[in-house]
């Protein structure tokens, strides 16, 4: 898509997935272990950023494209003002998107050239699935975790956050739709 996102149609189920590969950047004022959201922070999305598309390789069995997105994000968080900097830097995000003949999936390998501080970058893959849990990789395991935070989360000293640790995949699905 012109905004740097992907639209994918699953030819087996004819389900269409839109706005895949949207990047979201927000302030992170936590420590090295825990994400700490900043009050009154405004998330920045890659859909408003400069994006270029280039064919990297093409053959009878696979094609690879490079999506390069340059997100203008604040260079740091000013703790004395409790706000993000007014100075911005271009964070380059390169995603190699590969399609293989006969494969039922799209491969994405993303590299981020990050020179900014005090922020969290995450990638969004809206599945449209009505799921209560998701599957994630963990060292030597696959674990099932709830999609939403507990209702009593606000009562705990160290509150859970919506994001969970994982390295290679997350899967979310219901009876009709799903992504991994």
Label each PLM-derived region with a short phrase.
Residues 1-111, 123, 142-153:
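Catalytic and substrate-binding regions of extracellular carbohydrate-active enzymes
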Residues 114-116:
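Short, acidic/polar linear motifs in exposed loop/turn regions
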Residues 119-121:
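Active-site-proximal binding-pocket segments
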Residues 125-180:
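Polysaccharide-binding surfaces and accessory modules of carbohydrate-active proteins
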């Amino acid at each position: 898509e012109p905004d740097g996102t992907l639209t994918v149609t699953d030819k087996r189920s004819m389900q269409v997935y839109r706005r895949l590969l949207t990047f979201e950047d927000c302030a992170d004022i936590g420590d090295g272990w825990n994400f700490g959201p900043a009050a009154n922070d405004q998330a920045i999305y890659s859909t408003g950023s400069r994006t270029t598309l280039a064919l990297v390789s093409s053959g009878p069995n696979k094609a690879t494209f490079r999506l390069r997105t340059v997100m203008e994000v604040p260079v740091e968080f000013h703790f004395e003002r409790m706000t993000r900097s007014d100075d911005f830097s271009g964070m380059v995000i390169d995603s190699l998107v590969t399609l293989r003949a006969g494969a039922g999936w799209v491969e994405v390998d993303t590299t981020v050239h990050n020179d900014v501080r005090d922020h969290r970058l995450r990638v969004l893959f809206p599945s449209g699935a009505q799921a209560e849990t998701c599957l994630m990789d963990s060292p030597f395991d696959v674990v099932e975790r709830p999609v939403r935070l507990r209702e009593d989360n606000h009562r705990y000293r160290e509150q859970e956050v919506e994001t969970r640790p994982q390295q290679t995949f997350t899967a979310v699905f219901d009876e009709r739709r799903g992504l991994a």
